[in-house]
UniProtKB/Swiss-Prot annotation:
Catalyzes the attachment of valine to tRNA(Val). As ValRS can inadvertently accommodate and process structurally similar amino acids such as threonine, to avoid such errors, it has a 'posttransfer' editing activity that hydrolyzes mischarged Thr-tRNA(Val) in a tRNA-dependent manner. CDD domains: Anticodon_Ia_Val (cd07962), ValRS_core (cd00817). The gene is valS. Transmembrane segments: none annotated. This is Valine--tRNA ligase. It is an enzyme of class 6 (ligase). Keywords: Aminoacyl-tRNA synthetase, ATP-binding, Cytoplasm, Ligase, Nucleotide-binding, Protein biosynthesis. Monomer. Belongs to the class-I aminoacyl-tRNA synthetase family. ValS type 2 subfamily. A motif ('KMSKS' region) lies at residues 578-582. It comes from the Bacteria.
């Protein structure tokens, strides 16, 4: 054991993370499990492997690690895996930008394709889907290695032998297995239906991936003609006029009752459309009568379904006007007008449609400027459209009240931390407007294990899917051939075609409990850890990850996948805006970690209450600086105590701590020492209860408050007695230092491990969590009054602008119940350098003070 003369935090991360990994102290040992209650299992969030982690990841993953370390010290066998979410759009976009490539599924596979980083869109080259996926996997693996380095530096006590990816063969196998299970049970189905569509990514989007943004627009008033009158409607989307299939008004709106059942003619395109009543129409919105297009928004979908209207789509998957006029446009004038729109972007189509309306005087008045909410894909930059597409869905309770009630009940069975987050889950569940859309028209993702028979013209018969045998999983249907067919029948008449859609990333991430627990590969492991003890996650993905995981678990196991869930808050920038990579205000943690150290950053994260948003100013991170000061103080306090146990006669040489154990509690007899241990018991109890309730900030504050009081007051009071070799003081210092190191170990693992190594040859992170000492004697008020005494003495010297070393010839001081501290007056007088002291019962204050030789 080599204790430095001046303890330092530098280098501790590298020193101890290597030792932890090599000694495998955090590995989950299945053979040690004798009963489920021995295990504490964590369904760790797999971070998206696309670029860099930001400070928000450090924040929330620290919260989880604190609980993992605490439970391990509580005697649990902790299952704490790490996954990488390398499946989906973020990875695709990163690969496109990094290598300047675009995926073209029509191109053949190029073997041994090697590409370097380019980052130049103008030089983008097209590659095959298989080559594109290989690049995604290559770049993801590089990112994952960097992520693992950062997590190790942060001190996460993850079992690195329990890792998984959401796009490797195991993940594909598991996802395809449960998809086929869902198809067989009727929980998964295919439908041709209106779909929210992102024209930039050219893929369907689920309800859970939508966000509303306030957009400035205009209401345009258009004139529709019928036999007797002009009907005026207001719309923000005149470009959809060619897709109008009806006008709708509220059945009780007297302005339009006489029109119900009649028809009007659309301007420009001359289409005859009905005027119909529907209670979803809003009399106070616009002119009170609405144009129904297929489709402008979700309300259009509702009207289309409820009123059994025809479909007249005019937008393609790229967000342009379709090439051919829809069937309802039959007039020569209308078809000529549509031809001028064909192929235009929607913004160009809007401009041209308005020009045509103005030219025939079908625009009434001036446009009315508004700000209104518009739906966007959370990762997109253009408003969502609604297209009729073929998609795969999983039933989520949208149209099944019994399933909704069951999912609500499963939510209530969980312990939510904080409890208020349950309401978000329930609100989402009761506000669904569709089943869960799980198919995506992208390239990187779990392939659907499906082929379709073709008719005698080679067209896919989507109502006649071919499913594989479970023994053939995992597979890619664009490469594999269904049983009973040969490769030369692919795409041929009376042959087969592959499903080219891939599963939404949440369709795989919803199975992380099964994936991390190796449901298919190691049933014994899964049985030991499921249901998991904890799902930690962010509040923004309750509607996606948490909700979808409960659905999949209900279908697979008829139970919730965890017993509790801990929801972290957001990290805000100094302007109180949420930090995120998409907004460009997220800070990477490396610079902060390098500058202040992992323990300091962990301290900052631990100070925040669970579920509460926390601001961070990286230019002046006050709490991080406080955390660094705390970690350094732990080292200095431990060094002081260790050096007190050097050879008492010569006070030289290295300390021999082995002779200090086991601790002889009978040696503790001084009233001040016993009072401190009473307060320590209180600290242990409060900290333990706080951590059991996921209140890491309270646990840290409780222990930290005790520790600073211990250092600033108790140590100063007993220092002379300890230097003199008093067994009661020495034993108390040893006991308290050992226990405080344990109490702080989940929060600042590096400083506590370093300090512990000076006392012991084992790791503090394999020790048992402290239990209360339950000493029968000791008055907790004694230490409080003693601290008040010392505070007044220090304050008096500071006010007189004197050094704390200045001696006091005479002190008259008032304290409540001063008789309590009479037994320790010798300690107090020595600590305050006081010759004579007179105690008076009363409010705490100095009544008179005379200094000896002045020391400034």
């Amino acid at each position: 054991m080599n204790i430095p003369d001046k303890p330092s935090l530098e280098g501790l991360e590298e020193k101890w993370s290597k030792l932890w990994k090599s000694s495998k102290i955090y590995n989950f040992e299945l053979e040690q499990v004798s009963a489920k209650q021995d295990v504490y299992s964590i369904d760790t969030p797999p971070p998206t492997a696309s670029g860099v982690l930001h400070i928000g990841h450090v924040f929330s993953y620290t919260h989880t690690d604190i609980i993992a370390r605490f439970q391990r010290m509580q005697g649990k066998i902790v299952f704490y895996p790490m996954g990488w979410d390398d499946n989906g759009l973020p990875t695709e976009r990163r690969v496109q930008n990094y290598f300047s490539v675009r995926c073209d599924p029509s191109l053949p596979y190029c073997q041994n394709l090697k590409l370097a980083q380019i980052n130049n869109d103008s030089m983008a080259r097209s590659i095959s889907r298989r080559n594109f996926i290989e690049l995604c996997q290559q770049l993801s693996e590089e990112d994952e290695r960097k992520f693992e380095e950062l997590w190790n530096y942060l001190g996460l006590s993850v079992d690195w032998s329990q890792t998984y990816r959401t796009i490797d063969d195991d993940a594909i196998h598991l996802s395809q297995h449960f998809f086929l299970e869902n198809v067989n049970s009727g929980a998964a189905y295919q439908d041709w239906a209106p779909t929210l569509w992102d024209v930039t990514y050219r893929t369907a989007v689920a309800q859970a991936e939508i966000e509303e943004r306030q957009i400035t627009g205009f209401y345009y008033r258009l004139a529709f003609e019928n036999e007797n009158a002009t009907v005026e409607i207001e719309t923000t989307r005149p470009e959809l006029l060619a897709g109008c299939v009806a006008l709708v008004a509220h059945p009780d709106d007297n302005r339009y009752k006489h029109l119900f059942g009649s028809h009007v003619i659309t301007p420009v395109f001359d289409v005859k459309v009905p005027v119909l009543p529907h209670r979803a129409a809003q009399p106070d919105k616009g002119s009170g009568i609405a144009m129904v297009c297929t489709f402008g928004d979700i309300t259009d979908v509702q009207w289309w379904r409820d009123l059994n209207l025809q479909s007249c789509p005019i937008i393609d998957a790229s967000g342009r006007v379709v090439p051919d006029a829809p069937d309802p446009i039959v007039s020569e004038r209308g078809r000529r007008a549509f031809a001028t729109l064909s192929g235009k972007t929607l913004s160009a189509a809007k401009k041209h449609t308005l020009e045509m309306l103005i030219s025939e005087k079908s625009i009434i008045g001036e446009p009315r400027k508004i700000t209104h909410p518009v739906k966007f894909f959370e990762k997109g930059d253009k408003p969502l459209e609604i297209l009729l597409t073929r998609q795969w869905y999983i039933r989520n309770g949208y149209s099944d009240n019994a399933l909704t009630e069951r999912l609500i009940e499963l939510g209530k069975q969980l312990q939510w931390y904080p409890k208020t987050m349950l309401r978000r889950y329930e609100d989402w569940l009761t506000g669904l407007n569709s089943d869960w859309l799980i198919s995506r028209q992208r390239f990187l993702g779990v392939p659907f294990p499906i082929w379709y028979q073709t008719d005698d013209r080679g067209n896919a018969k989507f109502d006649d899917p071919i499913f594989p045998d479970r023994k053939d999983l995992p597979l890619d249907p664009t490469i594999a051939v269904p049983r009973g067919y040969s490769e030369n029948q692919r795409g041929a008449p009376n042959g087969f075609v592959a499903e080219t859609d891939v599963m939404d990333t949440w369709a795989t991430s919803s199975l992380t409990p099964q994936l991390a627990g190796k449901y298919l590969k190691n049933p014994k492991l899964f049985e030991a850890i499921f249901p998991y003890s904890l799902r930690p996650q962010g509040q923004d993905i309750i509607r996606t990850w948490l909700f979808s995981s409960i659905i999949r678990s209900e279908y697979a196991h008829a139970t919730a996948p965890w017993k509790s869930t801990a929801i972290s808050g957001f990290i805000l920038d100094p302007d109180r805006k949420k930090m995120s990579k998409s907004k460009g205000n997220a800070k990477t943690p490396k610079d902060i970690l390098d500058r202040y150290g992992a323990d300091a950053v962990r301290y900052w994260a631990a100070c925040a209450r669970l579920g509460v948003d926390t601001a961070l100013d990286v230019e002046n991170p006050t709490q991080i600086k406080i955390g660094r000061r705390l970690a350094l103080k732990v080292l200095n306090a431990a060094r002081f105590v260790v050096h007190l146990h050097k050879n008492k006669e010569t006070y030289s040489g290295q300390p021999d701590m082995k002779r200090c154990y086991p601790i002889d509690f009978a040696a503790i007899s001084n009233p001040l020492d016993l009072s401190l241990l009473k307060q320590l018991d209180q600290t242990i109890e409060q900290s333990t209860n706080a951590l059991k309730n996921f209140d890491h900030s309270k646990a840290l504050d409780t222990t930290e408050t005790f520790f600073w009081n211990f250092c600033d007051n108790y140590v100063e009071i007993v220092k002379d007695r300890a230097y003199a070799g008093d067994e009661s003081a020495l034993t108390t210092l040893l006991v308290v230092t050992n226990i405080v190191i344990k109490l702080l170990a989940p929060f600042i693992p590096y400083a506590t491990e370093e300090a512990w190594s000076w006392f012991n040859e084992t790791s503090v992170h394999t020790q048992s969590w402290p239990e209360t000492l339950k000493l029968h004697s000791g008055d907790i008020e004694l230490l409080k009054i003693a601290c008040s005494f010392m505070s007044l003495v220090r304050g008096g010297k500071t006010e007189a602008k004197l050094s704390q070393k200045t001696e006091i010839a005479y002190l008259k001081i008032a304290l409540p119940n001063p008789e309590i501290i009479m037994p320790i007056m010798d300690d107090l007088r020595r600590a305050g350098k006081i010759d004579k002291c007179e105690l008076i019962d009363g409010d705490a204050q100095i009544l008179a003070i005379e200094y000896g030789e002045i020391s400034r």
